[in-house]
Amino acid sequence: MDLTVTNLACARGGVTVLERVSFRLSRGAALILRGPNGIGKTTLLRTVAGLQPAVAGEISMPPEAVAYAAHADGLKATLTVAENLAFWAAIYGTDRAARAIERMNLAALADRQAQNLSAGQKRRLGLARLLVTGRPLWVLDEPTVSLDAASVALFGDVVRTHLAEGGAALMATHIDLGLAEAEVLDLAPYRAETPAGTEPADDPFAGVTA
């Protein structure tokens, strides 16, 4: 299933920040959002993922087809790496936990509690959830935060495999994942006109990636 976004408008803090956004993302393709901080990259990603309503426009893909990864890893601290992935696999109704451990190079950490992982290891575990979901569209908001160069390269390989298997990826990232096939969408032309005195309120997502 392709993702088609048509005349989408998104709001942050009750104020529209993007409008008339339209694009199509096909199976096997990746699209990287670009724009200055505060333009609304995170807001757009959250809207496509179904985490907040659109102000206007249409999104063709239902939230049930989307796997979303942002800054919070969503780990259960007292569960081991393997138990966290088994928990997510049960939620999503898949049997992909073992594959996720292998693909994200977590085998040596499988029996370690999440609370005892380094920041980079926690990030790899959080991203491993994408593999567990079995969902075709990955929506990624700065997915490489806390990852070292080797882990960035590893995750780039994981994304390429996802695309080769017919998945798609929509992301905001300042790090090169080595996705030569990825297209770029500059959000500057879609910035909404903001009346004086109605600037969007600060939110926990805007400071780093929006």
From Swiss-Prot:
Q: Which domain of life is it from?
A: Bacteria
A Pfam family hit: ABC_tran
Recorded catalytic reaction(s): these are: heme b(in) + ATP + H2O = heme b(out) + ADP + phosphate + H(+)
- Which cysteine pairs make disulfide bonds? none
InterPro entries the UniProt entry points to: AAA+_ATPase, ABC_transporter-like_ATP-bd, ABC_transporter-like_CS, ABC_transptr_haem_export_CcmA, P-loop_NTPase
User: What does this chain do?
Assistant: Part of the ABC transporter complex CcmAB involved in the biogenesis of c-type cytochromes; once thought to export heme, this seems not to be the case, but its exact role is uncertain. Responsible for energy coupling to the transport system.
Q: Spell out the subunit comment.
A: The complex is composed of two ATP-binding proteins (CcmA) and two transmembrane proteins (CcmB).
What family does the database annotate?
Belongs to the ABC transporter superfamily. CcmA exporter (TC 3.A.1.107) family.
Q: What is this protein called?
A: Cytochrome c biogenesis ATP-binding export protein CcmA
Species per Swiss-Prot/TrEMBL record:
Cereibacter sphaeroides (strain ATCC 17023 / DSM 158 / JCM 6121 / CCUG 31486 / LMG 2827 / NBRC 12203 / NCIMB 8253 / ATH 2.4.1.)
